[in-house]
Amino acid sequence: MEDFVRQCFNPMIVELAERAMKEYGEDLKIETNKFAAICTHLEVCFMYSDFHFINEQGESIIVELDDPNALLKHRFEIIEGRDRTMAWTVVNSICNTTGAEKPKFLPDLYDYKENRFIEIGVTRREVHIYYLEKANKIKSEKTHIHIFSFTGEEMATKADYTLDEESRARIKTRLFTIRQEMASRGLWDSFRQSERGEETIEERFEITGTMRRLADQSLPPNFSCLENFRAYVDGFEPNGYIEGKLSQMSKEVNAKIEPFLKTTPRPIRLPDGPPCSQRSKFLLMDALKLSIEDPSHEGEGIPLYDAIKCMRTFFGWKEPYVVKPHEKGINPNYLLSWKQVLAELQDIENEEKIPRTKNMKKTSQLKWALGENMAPEKVDFDDCRNISDLKQYDSDEPELRSLSSWIQNEFNKACELTNSIWIELDEIGEDVAPIEHIASMRRNYFTAEVSHCRATEYIMKGVYINTALLNASCAAMDDFQLIPMISKCRTKEGRRKTNLYGFIIKGRSHLRNDTDVVNFVSMEFSLTDPRLEPHKWEKYCVLEIGDMLLRSAIGQVSRPMFLYVRTNGTSKIKMKWGMEMRPCLLQSLQQIESMIEAESSVKEKDMTKEFFENKSETWPIGESPKGVEEGSIGKVCRTLLAKSVFNSLYASPQLEGFSAESRKLLLVVQALRDNLEPGTFDLGGLYEAIEECLINDPWVLLNASWFNSFLTHALR
């Protein structure tokens, strides 16, 4: 039956049913008929609600899924399928906003047109018997009852069927189909009887004669009689069964299930080698901004105009020179490229009208930096089919790198607060459904905690840079276009601010496929001296380009200003994902919501307000060598956001592989902590799969280090 349910119903419905059974302490492996009944009831509730909307005139209308009008208000609020706490929160909110009488039991739906709660019943018995049982239980004339059966019958309060005939016919057809599918698999009789709690034939009668002989003949191979088979099933040990099955599959497979104990797991081995280097597409904690407040200049909002205005705010330019060369690059070319940018920006300022975009002259230094004419010539395969020694290039294995402290510092910095506001509260219309009040409250609290966060700045910076680069790649394919790296924010006082981080020069960009690469040179301002952590800046040539006066406790101090220059590349698909970094905010909000839900279900009321306003309470943030780190709810929000943002900034195959494989080990460890006595086979193979993803990526190496801290403290 369980297999049938998983095949027959939408995975979302199955998941909700699993959650409901778990909430009431029922085992779906044992109560399989109940599992099927819950899924059926959920599906009927969803079908009841589907396609029914209320238009601006307050009339009920039916709208198909692909109709643009689907943004209308839903006619029905679905209460069934939510966890108890959230369901009661929705019911209370509906009662408060509509004046409806609060029901004693949780109903399934609320009808905004008829202004009444609805109890949906799905029965395998006579509809009128089930209707009377429901009515006696509810004892309220205010809640409307609507019963469906698997035979196509229905019954509703005062014969008011709420929906049109076609909508009800869809539900009846679906129930009839489920019944037929169950019957074809021999599941229907057991399912039908289970609603009445009838005893099965085996319990009532001793099986004798022909039926007994048929039972003995219907057993799997190697069983001589029904008693033997029953004894086998009663003493069934799944672990041994899996071993046996695996050994039948292949002579090579010899899996012995080993118990997983506290002493079983070992730490993940991190690679040795030179320290890992920075590989993000733009500088993070080391970035420096040239900013203008309350921009009101001519052409404000046009990137090139904004960039020139920001450049004019700095007066400490000096003759640039290389302070940290790139080991494999032609460093004078990077120096000449920066001088060319300065010269061409000066030329623009001397013109009467500043152009909207700037294409750089194709000088030898830029051609070199952008890899112009460096790609090997492509030859049609048919022209070289007959070459006997045709072979692919031998590619070198990537060099193993060790974890370096800078990536933990980057992450810590991403969790910190800045002096600026990087996102506004969404201008979302008035809440329509009661559940939206809670959602809005949570969103507003969360936004207040993360709007000043440096990780949020990285989101807005990443979105801007990737959007500008993709636009330029499509609009000026052959040009070396100069793209300012800009972001917008507000000061704490609410004044608008435009920031310039540096410039990008893009190369030729005839991007036919999603993975075709466009080369670019990035030039970014910074106050970080690269000589302090030279291994971090392996891929960069760093110039000293000026001196900046900074206010400090002892007055004004002069600090050298650096320019971090490197050749880089990206593709259409990477730029697309870079443009879509905003969902990182949503992902971390959902993680916080699940924490609130857990707390609310324990306290049996919505805990959103207490969660965010109780500043004295601390929450677990993560593992470190010292143990479980804790912090305020704001710190938790910002840490979750930073993790999501870094997953986007440092996305790579190594990260995908590590996340997927380490999750398996994590689940086994969690099962051990929950006293579920997990067993494993080929644990060495799992460690191998995890460790082959640890090559040179700083973010993956840091996650592996965190995982080891978790293992240490989880298994004490």
Curated annotation (Swiss-Prot):
Q: Does the entry feature the keyword Calcium, yes or no?
A: no
Post-translational changes noted in the entry: Phosphorylated on serines and threonines by host kinases, including human casein kinase II.
The record's comment on cofactor binding reads: Binds 2 manganese ions per subunit.
**Compartment annotation:** Host cytoplasm; Host nucleus
Pfam families attached to this UniProt entry: Flu_PA
Residues bound to Mn(2+) 2 are: 80, 108
Q: Does the keyword Cytoplasm apply?
A: no
Locus of motif Nuclear localization signal 2 (NLS2) = 184-247
User: Which intervals of this chain are the motif Nuclear localization signal 1 (NLS1)?
Assistant: 124-139
- Molecular function per GO: endonuclease activity; metal ion binding; RNA binding
Tell me, in a sentence or two, what this protein's role is.
Answer: Plays an essential role in viral RNA transcription and replication by forming the heterotrimeric polymerase complex together with PB1 and PB2 subunits. The complex transcribes viral mRNAs by using a unique mechanism called cap-snatching. It consists in the hijacking and cleavage of host capped pre-mRNAs. These short capped RNAs are then used as primers for viral mRNAs. The PB2 subunit is responsible for the binding of the 5' cap of cellular pre-mRNAs which are subsequently cleaved after 10-13 nucleotides by the PA subunit that carries the endonuclease activity.
Question: What family is this?
Answer: Belongs to the influenza viruses PA family.
Question: What protein name applies here?
Answer: Polymerase acidic protein
Instruction: Show the taxonomic lineage.
Output: Viruses, Riboviria, Orthornavirae, Negarnaviricota, Polyploviricotina
